[in-house]
Design a protein with these regions (language model features):
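Helix-coil boundary/capping segments in enzymes
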Residues: 1-333
Length: 333
């Protein structure tokens, strides 16, 4: 184990354990998966229009990951799954995939207790199974939160079927991290990498709006929700949500104006702009911002710590909060 001492926590970092990949390779082809090994690069898989990989060593090999973390000056990664999650699988297989992934998170933490923690995945498309996995995973070593897509098989997070799961997560005291998988209008976003560049941030905004207008945040006042990609479109378009609330009677059912929900969320730094990070600080506050990288995808920050520490408009206290203190408090480190 590396003995380097850093004070930076990356909350947006993806991980594919070999045990999880083995299950996809074995069972995926029977459920619409195309799975292949790209020579010299690792496995690549496709489900519908979602293509993932090649999944290189940094996604799988914990020692390779720790080496990168040391090079970046990062103390800890909060490990999470990426597309296509487990929602493609029927109940029993989805449960097995989730348990396999979350058990791998626990083993990673036990191997590197100061460096690696986990955000547990859930078979939330099967809410009864998800409820059981919330209970089980919350007790695993190193699990510090839960990870859910911004929509699940076409259902938005305001769907009543998901409410019991969110209630159980709230009761656990652990935060809920969101991440896009399917994106709105993907047929128009296939060119120019727009599925990621535009589709993902708009998905985050739509998910936030559903949690607000769907009453989820009102019903669950202690639920902590973390948005990726600096909140996507949500913090930038909250004025439009506010205007709709002011002018439309059918939006008056929520307890307060949409802008008042900005601080119900946390936001990572994966916005790729000094201006975005400054906006989050000015409008929401540095105490709600968490450092992220999007490792180990090619779009990830090479120097996620420096993005914050070199920011010209943030003071030393704000930088400490974003790089380390907020995540340490939220994830109980």
């Amino acid at each position: 184990m590396s003995q380097h001492v850093h004070h930076a926590i990356d909350v947006h970092s993806h991980y594919f354990p070999q045990s999880f990949l083995d299950l996809i390779e074995k069972h995926g082809p029977g459920h619409g998966f195309e799975y292949k090994i790209v020579e010299g690069k690792g496995p690549q898989f496709k489900h519908g229009h979602l293509v993932t990989g090649p999944v290189g060593p940094k996604f799988v090999d914990l020692d390779a990951r720790i080496q990168v973390m040391d090079e970046q000056g990062v103390e800890a990664h909060a490990l999470s799954l990426s597309q296509p999650m487990v929602y493609w699988a029927p109940g029993n297989l989805a449960q097995r995939l989730s348990e396999t992934y979350n058990d791998a998170l626990a083993r990673a933490h036990e191997r590197h207790p100061r460096r690696l923690i986990g955000l547990a995945t859930l078979p939330i498309h099967e809410p009864a199974l998800a409820l059981k996995e919330v209970e089980r995973a919350a007790k695993l070593p190193g699990v510090r939160g839960f990870y859910v897509a911004t929509q699940v098989l076409g259902k938005d997070l305001s769907d009543a079927a998901f409410l019991p799961v969110f209630e159980r997560i709230e009761a656990s005291g652990l935060p809920l991290f969101l991440h896009p998988v399917e994106v709105i209008g993907h047929q128009r976003l296939t060119a120019y990498y727009l599925t990621n560049l535009l589709g993902n941030p708009f998905e985050s905004g739509i998910a936030a709006a559903h949690l607000i207008f769907g009453g989820v945040l009102d019903r669950l006042p202690k639920l902590v929700v973390c948005l990726p990609h600096s909140g996507g479109a949500f913090p930038w378009l909250v004025g439009r949500l506010n205007r709709g609330w002011e002018k439309r009677a059918d939006l008056k059912h929520i307890k307060q104006a949409p802008v008042e929900y900005l601080r119900r969320f946390y936001y990572d730094t994966v916005g790729y702009s000094d201006h975005v990070l400054q906006y989050l600080d000015e409008v929401i506050g540095a105490d709600r911002v968490l450092m992220g990288s999007d490792d180990c995808f090619p779009i990830a920050y090479e120097k996620p710590v420096e993005i914050v520490t070199a920011h010209p408009r943030l003071n030393a206290e704000q930088k400490r909060k974003i790089v380390d203190e907020n995540a340490r408090r939220l994830l109980r480190l």
